[in-house]
């Protein structure tokens, strides 16, 4: 073991090609597996980009290096200076003949989890040992795809004229009038972890910034314990001025479609590692109204009365009919937040929408109320006190333009892109009702 590395990596495993035959390289990573067959040792080294085979015949590497390699164990951290040897029979068409070995650190054994995946493990065990679980190629593939998605989202929004912002996560009161908040001690006062950047996004529409977005954590003290809910999540939020609900849906379509394309074009290796069938959606998603959605549910035997939110059973029934990505629009005003703009012709419905993937809601948005008096009236209708929203309401007194926006769940969107059934698979260190560590 060493305190200071004497080398620096020259190549990741994926950078090495058979055409580099005879070239000297330095590779670094973990011992994925080791196998000794008499006077020859095979070591599979794993790094972020894949694996590479190191072949050490005793007669070529010498007694000292051979003995050093033989002492290696699973998950030891090593650096190897070696020569590329083209070999059609080897994985990837080449192998590495080691010239020198540096054992950077050793792994305690037995391992609580097998990164080589020879021994399966339950999700709870994997999450308890997430640092080891994340060494598994399939798990890394999920987060490389997630990274690609976030990069794509940012690129699309920048190209559409949006500015990235950061809003407070320590707040004095609730965002949307609910009670699902985590209280914290804030010096001599009580504060809360923010459940949404919603009110701040809207306030920014009064500044002239016009189009803003934020990718940040949100916190909700909901007692759900399902495969699709977490108490800390990452939300992709946008707000756009001089826009309505249709404009917001158009931007959401672009963001989601472009993310699919970028993942498909740039993460083929990860898609293959996950073993999934990855299909691009159409550029335009189907749009059905809330009325049409409950008609589908009722026709399938799931009773939903007008004005009720969609139950889990209703979402499943609608998802079976619609498949893929689709919008549900024109929701009852009663079940949407106070800041949602009602329809001019029928105030019982509002300009809100959800983006669904089969039976999974991945985004929710709306045109917002920009008129001060109507907003105060709506706050009261929801049984809330306008005095609790003073700082927010001030922004609507001095020239607030029409605006719309949405929030897209990054974790759920990753579920869709990687075809995972459990949201915990798509978050590095998930926080749910039971899990606060690691």
Curated annotation (Swiss-Prot):
Gene Ontology biological process terms from the UniProt entry: aspartyl-tRNA aminoacylation
What does the record note on quaternary structure?
Homodimer.
Look up the record and name the cofactor or cofactors this protein needs: Mg(2+)
User: What does it catalyze?
Assistant: tRNA(Asx) + L-aspartate + ATP = L-aspartyl-tRNA(Asx) + AMP + diphosphate
Q: Which residues bind ATP?
A: 220-222, 228-230, 361, 409-412
Q: GO terms for molecular function, please? A: aspartate-tRNA ligase activity; aspartate-tRNA(Asn) ligase activity; ATP binding; magnesium ion binding; RNA binding
The family line of this record is: Belongs to the class-II aminoacyl-tRNA synthetase family. Type 2 subfamily.
Q: Where is this site: Important for tRNA non-discrimination?
A: 91
Where, by residue number, does Mg(2+) 3 bind? 361
Q: Which residues bind L-aspartate?
A: 176, 220, 364, 368
Entry's NCBIfam families?
aspS_nondisc (TIGR00458), PRK05159.1 (NF003483)
Give any Gene Ontology cellular component.
aminoacyl-tRNA synthetase multienzyme complex
Q: This protein is called what? A: Aspartate--tRNA(Asp/Asn) ligase
* HAMAP family in UniProt: Asp_tRNA_synth_type2
Q: Which residues bind Mg(2+) 2?
A: 361, 364
Function comment:
Aspartyl-tRNA synthetase with relaxed tRNA specificity since it is able to aspartylate not only its cognate tRNA(Asp) but also tRNA(Asn). Reaction proceeds in two steps: L-aspartate is first activated by ATP to form Asp-AMP and then transferred to the acceptor end of tRNA(Asp/Asn).
Pfam families registered for this protein in UniProt: tRNA-synt_2, tRNA_anti-codon
Task: Alphabetically list the UniProt keywords.
Answer: Aminoacyl-tRNA synthetase, ATP-binding, Cytoplasm, Ligase, Magnesium, Metal-binding, Nucleotide-binding, Protein biosynthesis
Provide the transmembrane region boundaries: none
Region annotated Aspartate sits at: 198-201
Q: How is the cofactor bound?
A: Binds 3 Mg(2+) cations per subunit. The strongest magnesium site (Mg1) is bound to the beta- and gamma-phosphates of ATP and four water molecules complete its coordination sphere.
- UniProt keyword Oxidoreductase present: no
Q: Which domain of life is it from?
A: Archaea
Q: What is its EC number?
A: 6.1.1.23
* Subcellular compartments: Cytoplasm
């Amino acid at each position: 073991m060493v305190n200071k590395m004497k080398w620096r990596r020259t190549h990741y495993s994926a950078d090495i090609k058979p055409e580099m035959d005879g070239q000297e390289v330095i590779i670094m990573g973990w011992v994925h597996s080791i196998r000794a067959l008499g006077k020859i040792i095979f070591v599979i080294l794993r790094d972020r980009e894949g694996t590479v085979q190191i072949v050490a015949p005793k007669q070529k590497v010498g007694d000292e290096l051979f003995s050093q390699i033989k002492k290696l164990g699973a998950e030891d951290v090593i650096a190897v200076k070696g020569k590329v040897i083209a070999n059609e029979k080897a994985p990837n068409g080449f192998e590495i003949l080691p010239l020198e070995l540096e054992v950077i650190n050793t792994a305690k054994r037995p391992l609580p989890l097998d990164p080589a995946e020879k021994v399966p493990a339950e999700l709870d065990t994997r999450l308890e040992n997430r640092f080891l679980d994340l060494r598994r190629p399939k798990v890394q593939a999920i987060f490389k795809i997630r990274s690609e998605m976030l990069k794509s989202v940012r690129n699309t929004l920048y190209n559409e004229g949006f500015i990235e912002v950061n809003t407070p996560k320590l707040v004095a009161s609730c965002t949307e009038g609910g009670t699902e908040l985590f209280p914290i001690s804030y010096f001599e006062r009580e504060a809360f972890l923010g459940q949404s950047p919603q009110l701040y996004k809207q306030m920014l529409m009064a500044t002239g910034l016009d189009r803003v977005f934020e990718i940040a954590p949100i916190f909700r003290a909901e007692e759900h314990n399902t495969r699709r809910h977490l108490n800390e999540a990452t939300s992709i939020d946008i707000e756009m001025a001089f826009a309505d609900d249709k404009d917001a849906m158009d931007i959401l379509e672009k963001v989601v479609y472009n993310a699919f394309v970028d993942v498909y074009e740039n993460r083929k290796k990860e898609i293959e590692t996950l073993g999934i069938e990855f299909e691009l959606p159409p550029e335009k998603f189907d749009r059905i109204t809330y009325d049409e959605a409950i008609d589908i549910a009722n026709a399938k035997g799931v009773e939903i009365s007008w004005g009720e939110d969609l139950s889990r059973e209703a979402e499943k029934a609608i998802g079976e009919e619609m498949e893929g990505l689709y919008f549900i629009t024109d929701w009852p005003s009663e079940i949407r937040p106070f800041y949602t703009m009602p329809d001019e012709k029928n105030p019982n419905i509002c300009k809100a929408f959800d983006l669904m993937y089969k039976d999974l809601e991945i985004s929710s948005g709306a045109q917002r109320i920009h008129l001060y008096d109507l907003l105060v009236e709506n706050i009261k209708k929801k049984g809330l006190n306008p005095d609790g929203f003073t700082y927010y309401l001030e922004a609507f007194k001095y020239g607030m333009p029409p605006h719309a926006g949405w929030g897209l769940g990054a974790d759920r969107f990753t579920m869709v892109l990687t075809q995972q059934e459990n949201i915990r698979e798509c978050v590095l260190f998930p926080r749910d009702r039971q899990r606060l560590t690691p």
